[in-house]
Amino acid sequence: MLTSSMPQNLSLFGFSPLKSSSFALILRPFSLYPPIFASSSPAPSRRPPRTAGYRRSGPSPPRRKWSSFEEQKRKGRSPMEKDKAISFNHSSDSFEFNKRRAEGLDKVDKPKKNLKRNTRTLNPTNTIAYVQILGTGMDTQDTSPSVLLFFDKQRFIFNAGEGLQRFCTEHKIKLSKVDHIFLSRVCSETAGGLPGLLLTLAGIGEQGLSVNVWGPSDLKYLVDAMRSFIPRAAMVHTRSFGPSLNISDSAPQIGLSKPKDDAYVLVDDEVVKISAILLEPSRLEESGSKPGETAVIYVCELPEIKGKFDPKKAMALGLRAGPKYSYLQSGQSVKSDFKDITVHPSDVMGPSVPGPVVLLVDCPTESHAEELLSIPSMKTYYSCLDNSTDGAKLVNCIIHLSPASVTNSSTYRSWMKRFHSAQHILAGHEAKNMEFPILRASSRITARLNYLCPQFFPAPGFWSHQHDNNSINPTSLSKCFDSNLGESISAENLLKFTLRPHGNLGVDRSSIPSRLTALRVMDELLSEIPEISSKTEEIKQLWNGQHNKMMIEEPWLGESTVPSCLENIRRDDMEIVLLGTGSSQPSKYRNVTAIYIDLFSRGSILLDCGEGTLGQLKRRYGLEGADEAVRNLRCIWISHIHADHHTGLARILARRRELLKGLAHEPAIVVGPRSLKNFLDAYQRLEDLDMEFLDCRNTTTTSWASVETSRPEKNTSSGNAEGSLFSKGSLMQSIYKRPSSPLTDNSSALPFLKKLKKVLGEMGLEHLISFPVVHCPQAFGVSLKAAERKNIAGDEIPGWKMVYSGDTRPCPEMVEASKGATVLIHEATFEDALVEEAVAKNHSTTKEAIKVGSSAGVYRTVLTHFSQRYPKIPVIDESHMHNTCIAFDMMSINMADLHVLPKILPYFKTLFRNQVVEEEEEEEETDDDSLIRDKVPSFFIN
């Protein structure tokens, strides 16, 4: 137990994270004092490590140089000897491993993966084949829906927008079975989920998987950008087609010499032929396309089904049963056995059934639609032309990914009329889908939390009870055009069009999920937990004046009153919205990391921006409210380069640029690690992001000092937050102090620092300070502090202070930066029993995160970034949660409600008492069911 008599200044103990003796203090378990004060190491977990998602899959890597518990057990050591060995090894070898990891050398001696592609024996007859709408973005309109082309032995996906992994996890669609991914355009709307998907596939199994990725020539730009954080092996099968854009050969390119109007054959086997037809906007003067403008029409043609062989006809033509029957069925003519004639296959075979043809059309603008009418290679598929046209093919289904503004235009309708009998499925953004949450599991959790505590979990507009009775009838938009266009329906999530067997050819609605509404969720909740309504009333009383006195007098607050910075604080001062609270990769219940700092009329800041952040904003604020939230973004801060913290950034910035187009505005300021700039610079060749970049190293305490003096920063060792990790001569300094690093010369960053200072002042903030943490190279935490304000009496009172850890092991820099914080948001990836895994992956356990807050004297600590092994709620020792709360997606913490926060935690215990721990992937399941059952029905240790 830490006592107030112990000194807080770690420099008194000669602490340095680059000394093995110092790392012994923080790595197992975390303690701010010498080993004599540290508690004994917790027992190792019996559970196998879970997939790390974006960064690693499968078992944890072997601990280099130190002995694992399993090795010690095999060596037959006694418990006492084992404890001594662990303590000794950890003080030296753990340091060596973490030092190598901080230097980025932990993978040098790790053999590189040669990712394999799926190879399967194809089945030409395909007893089952269909196309299916994967409704990503159909409720939030933040991304393009995907389309799955399914065969017995092959899978093809068209478009990989943000949220695709999360969607497939919930609906049990195995992405590991996917062979090819096709992009109809190369932009954040259609490819926002591709980086995370490639990383996840690369981590499957011992060898990892790689898929073929196809797209127009713009794909080269995306590949160049992704190289900054995705292994090259994961992208070796990316292929672009179409005219070259005169850039580096990042991806192999096919069809360079073909006329642009010709179709490019991408896949042609016994199962399917997939061709691509380029579609560019019409131009009066300019020639050539700009990056991001090229769209693609994909044509999927299945082989014909040969007619049935008729043995009676064969016998009548003088053929005896034998090998000649097989020759005829294979298409060869044979001589009759008893007649002087030649028997042709058509004489004995029934009529063949033409193979189905499916078109996927992405026509993003009316300018593209004008060109659509004049594409020569499309004439083969028009049924309105003369039936005598050679090679005419009947199109069975057309999936329109085009927006409603285009499909409703007269130009587009005239093109659609050329396919008389085709089934049209309109999969663009349709308003009716707002009433049908696509991510049902997380929507159900959010609705339950909203019922329990609407103060911390407000519901968006389309989840409110008022909208339940006014929703649009799902069949009201089914018929979209006149009868001359054939049958046209609006796409719904998981809608299928069956291609095989031929007898079932057509639309199949059997997989469409039933409608989920807030009222339905409430009925389920009240039936499951009848006393939840009384708990809701108890929570309401926490905001009453009669209960405030009780809360202030709670002995565990550590203060006689709430902090002075919260005195008479207004509700429009600041609100923390936790958009994503999971780690590694998206799951059914938690998205990856993103925190929206709402300063209301003064603007907003985003701390980290994992994949799907824009969609989460729309689920929190509604469609119009989310657009306003994006418009108000002034600054985006990224902690480190791991994909679960930044792959939603391009989509957010692109949407902001789109919303502010034509309006007077300033570019968004993006603060992040230097490696992020490499990604953004490369990506902006594809899509303008309207941003300015500032390295986190330029926003440390010493860098801000250079703004005050208007002189370049001189690197000196000091006692500030970054001093111990980057002290003169340290190994960490050698990592970052390179000729191109802003640490060497801060002069180029001064204009951007001054601009950031101006923006912070306009938002009522005194500072934004980044500080290094122990996770990976160029990993940072951040501190935000509000400016002083006057109370009712006119007295100056300090502004609040908020600190966010990013991903980190507990470290003195984290404690130092958190001193006096009003609220600390700290990662707590692992439960306390998994400290070994936390050390190996440079993350924190829940107890360690809480210790950081208590050691720094933080008023409130919010735990986040939970491992996805905990589907709904993490394993928590409730006795440590005196001034702490756990975070959920969509949780909104207003500074005016901060004093109530810890009192809510026990009510979560009631809400989730009947929930069980779910392992979301079959590969993760263990035989030790008792281990899982030990953690239910309660997720707390009383």
From Swiss-Prot:
Transit peptide: 1-50
Bias (Basic and acidic residues) ranges: 67-85
Catalytic activity, reaction form: Endonucleolytic cleavage of RNA, removing extra 3' nucleotides from tRNA precursor, generating 3' termini of tRNAs. A 3'-hydroxy group is left at the tRNA terminus and a 5'-phosphoryl group is left at the trailer molecule
Stretch list, region Disordered: 38-85
Disruption outcome: No visible phenotype due to the redundancy with TRZ3. Trz3 and trz4 double mutants are lethal.
Main location: mitochondrion
Molecular function in Gene Ontology: 3'-tRNA processing endoribonuclease activity; metal ion binding
Biological role: Zinc phosphodiesterase, which displays tRNA 3'-processing endonuclease activity. Involved in tRNA maturation, by removing a 3'-trailer from precursor tRNA. Can process the mitochondrial tRNA-like structures (t-elements).
Quaternary structure, from the entry: Homodimer.
Protein name: tRNAse Z TRZ4, mitochondrial
